[in-house]
Amino acid sequence: MREQIMPQQNFTTTISVDQSPEEVFDAVNDVRGWWSGEIDGTTDKLGAEFRYRYQDLHRTTQRITEFVPGKKVVWHVVESHINFVADKTEWNGTDVVFEITRRGDKTELRFTHIGLVPAIQCYGDCVGAWGFYINDSLLNLITRGKGQPNKKEEAGK
């Protein structure tokens, strides 16, 4: 008997802006400007790794595995710890993909988190967070020059 496997629905969202693909690419790589002030490491070089932390709830290490100026960036999650789910490492081995395409007089940014699927426990919370960071914070960084990243925590807090 063969088991039928349902296709996994990776989380994806798309925004369209007036800015050039190069401007969108630069904003994507300004991770501290739209995701978090709690980023350590290099976020704009092929092969580089950077770490993200949000309080004691979530931390990850990403390696930049694709870096094509004006077109594409891929982060491979090499380590993660999500404190509010049973499998604290459920992001390990997933990929965060930013694809940039010129469509007429607009630039389209398609964000996909490959491996962030409804079957994993953090899906609802993680989709909500990515939705904000991409559709609000990154969009505002691209179009207005200022995103809404998590602030860097003060020492001792």
Give names to the regions the model predicted.
Residues M1-T43:
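Hydrophobic ligand-binding cavity/cleft-lining segments
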Residues Q8, Q55-L57:
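Glycine-centered tight beta-turn/hairpin loop motif at sheet-sheet or coil-to-beta transitions
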Residues A48-Q55, V85:
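Short aromatic-glycine motifs in intrinsically disordered, low-complexity regions
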Residues S36-G41, H58-D105, I114-L116:
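Hydrophobic-ligand binding "helix-grip"
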Residues T14-S16, R51-R53, R63, E99:
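Generic structural detector for well-ordered beta-strands
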